[in-house]
Amino acid sequence: MQPKNLQSGIRDNYHRGTVGDFLKEKIKEDSHLSVVSAYFTIYAFEAIKDKLCGIDRLDFLFGEPRFIKSLDPNKTDKKAFIVDADGLTLANRLQQKAIAKECADWITAKVAIKSVKQSNFLHGKMYHIASNGVEEAIMGSSNFTVRGLGLGAHGNNIELNLEVDSNRDRQDIKTWFNEIWNDPQLVQDVKQDVLLYLAPPQNLWL
């Protein structure tokens, strides 16, 4: 068995550190985040909200167009919301409703959200952070879920992510992101759809 806490640029949510800890370490006040992920959960927001609430902005690109289900994968009815798919037990539905509202307020103020139009088209996962002229990035397999970030209390996904330690590569990654983000043939704005999903009574938080 390998020792824990190996010094490595790999973040696997196992022996080599977590993506969540990378984000908590690198995100600063007024950071500009660019993220590509197939999933977004309010519980991942809750797990690192102390950092996320201080950012300047987040550009979030869904790599899978089924974005409404991606907000909370595998939730199909009200009873499924008692315990989320990431293993985070919540006390009651009122607490879930409060998290959803806080997340919606944050999205309204600081987040732009787009989705690729074509299913099974964009597979990469990426987190780029720009803070006061300093760039940080990590890319690999981790989605923006509690388990994907390695922050689950009852087990996490083993992922394969690599910190990008070259300035040239970090700049190339951001250029690549911008090219897709600004291409209307590939992506569409879905922010209002996401906010509609999070807003009562349309959602399942009640």
Task: Briefly describe each language-model feature range.
Residues 1-206:
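PLD/PLD-like phosphodiesterase catalytic module centered on the HKD motif
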